A protein has these predicted regions:
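Secretory-pathway lumenal glyco-enzymes, predominantly type II signal-anchor Golgi glycosyltransferases
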Residues: 2-501
Length: 501
């Protein structure tokens, strides 16, 4: 007789109703009773196994501390809070106790919290005895909790683990200080977009090490690479950056949900004023590249130089050219924007004459930001963050200012200590002193496309790159940044084309 499987205490009646007519009633009752006993034992075993598995998941979930690498800007903090709610909702639907979810920008007023290491002591003190993992992710990382638990279960939580999706340089690059020049592929570092995890034994070890070897005053340039400079990264294939709807995402515990944030209609061309820093010696080789590539995307653009040349045209700001730093020139641009440009222009972008940029994509991105807030946006670097330093936007990838940010900056009287001071770092110091946070966007790039891992760029729609050295800048622009690509290809096709380059 086929045996009916079911849950709860209601299985016996349907089973008995399905019994066929038997010639020996006593025997039939005996057989049915034996059948019932077997099924009860099986059901009890199944329920016990299910309950045990459920309790195990509950315990495992409580042992993970989720840390979202969030930012205080209103757009980014909202996205981080949305992710926090998603994590808690998944846990609630599983019927489990809610895990701890931390947002980095809420954890520490210290400007270096985003570099993670300054938080190791707090992680160790707060969670070193009652947790097994610290799981880090970005605001656009999407997590499937059950699959994440299944993935972490493969690793002995009593050992030191550094887990993530592995990236590597294909050739040595300036942004990583030409590290591992003989074979840069041997060094693996995590892609933050896929999420990454530290076991508590490793967190405790790092916290103890930082007690005896305090963080030095130094530059933070590429955090994910510098975080990989220590215990070896163990690649985890379930930590993914595939799109949520990709067929590849079936096996993934994490995915990445956004390539280029868009929050409505792109801002108008006339709402962005672009200032190009140049000098006479580059009028003939760099400015023509700008005119062949992105200049036509901008409605308002001016070239600022040490020499006025009407054919371009350039504007002499009366600040002598310097071989480095350019702080005097940058602050003169800020003054000019505030005092001479239309008061209705809400955004200023300052770029170098060898910056390649997509104004079309920038217009989309800026739809997510409120120009009435003091916004200072670009690729974030840091200096001396372990010892009370500051963050700054690196100038080569482009610096984006809201008018409100410039007004607050100039009203503060913070200024250059010399014309050749590093403008981006001085701006970082000034905004830090004002309590205005730097807003990081990884779509801005200080270096060339070839200086970044292919897998890292594959989940981006980049906004800028920098430097013409050893490349064909016009070709690179039309490969990576030209607006016609949005009309001609889907994001997936773009990525496939880039992989073939």
């Amino acid at each position: 007789m086929p045996r009916e499987r079911g849950g709860g205490g209601c299985w016996l009646l349907p089973a008995l109703l399905l019994l066929p007519p038997l010639c020996a009633p006593a025997l039939a009752i005996s057989v049915a009773a034996e059948d019932a006993k077997e099924q009860i034992e099986r059901l009890v075993s199944q329920e016990s196994e299910k309950s045990g598995k459920s309790n195990k998941i509950n315990i495992e979930l409580q042992e993970i501390v989720f840390v979202i690498q969030s930012q205080s800007n209103s757009f980014h903090s909202k996205r981080a809070e949305d992710l926090e709610r998603n994590i808690l909702k998944q846990a609630e639907e599983l019927g489990k106790e809610l895990p701890r979810v931390l947002l980095i920008h809420q954890m520490d007023r210290h400007d270096g919290a985003w570099t993670i290491l300054p938080l190791m002591h707090d992680f160790s003190a707060s969670y070193g005895r009652n947790s097994s993992w610290i799981f880090f992710c970005e605001e656009d990382t999407r997590i499937q909790i059950v699959k994440l638990l299944e993935t972490l279960r493969r690793f002995d939580k009593s050992k030191e683990w550094f887990l993530g999706k592995a990236l590597y340089d294909e050739e040595s690059t300036i942004i990583h200080h030409y590290a591992f020049a003989e074979n840069p592929t041997v060094f693996k570092f995590p892609d933050f977009a896929a999420g990454w995890a530290l076991s508590i034994p490793l967190v405790n070890k790092l916290a103890n090490k930082l007690k005896s070897e305090p963080l030095k005053s130094d530059f933070t340039i590429d955090l994910k690479h510098e975080k990989g400079n220590g215990p070896h990264l163990t690649p985890v294939p379930e930590f993914c950056t595939d799109d949520l709807n990709s067929y590849k995402a079936v096996h993934c515990a994490t995915m990445f949900s956004n390539f280029l944030p868009v929050c409505g209609d792109p801002v108008k061309k006339e709402d962005i004023f672009v200032a190009v820093k140049t000098c006479q010696k580059f009028h003939r080789d760099r400015i023509p590249i700008v005119k062949q590539t992105w200049e036509s995307e901008a409605a308002l653009v001016e070239y600022y130089s040490d020499y006025a040349e009407t054919s371009i045209p350039t504007i002499d700001l009366g600040v002598p050219n310097t071989e480095r730093g350019h702080c005097g020139k940058t602050f003169a641009i800020l003054e000019r924007f505030l005092n001479q440009s239309s008061s209705k222009t809400p955004w200023l972008v300052i770029v170098d004459d060898d910056t390649l940029i997509s104004i079309f994509r920038l217009r989309k991105l800026l739809s997510c930001y409120d120009p009435n807030e003091p916004v200072f946006l670009g690729e974030r670097y840091g200096y001396g963050l372990g010892t009370g330093g500051y963050s700054y936007i690196t100038g080569g990838g482009g610096m984006v200012f809201s008018r409100e940010a410039i007004q607050k900056l100039l009203a503060s009287k913070c200024q250059c200590y010399s014309n050749d001071a590093p403008d981006d770092m001085v701006l970082g110091m000034c905004f830090s002193g004002l309590g205005i946070p730097i807003t990081h966007c990884p779509l801005f790039h200080q270096a060339r496309p070839m200086d970044y891992p292919k897998d890292y760029l594959a989940h981006q729609i980049p906004i800028s790159f920098h430097k013409h050295w050893n490349i064909n800048p016009v070709k690179e622009y039309f490969t990576w940044l030209a607006p016609k690509m949005e009309d001609s290809f889907t994001e997936k096709k773009q990525r496939r084309i880039r992989e073939d380059l």
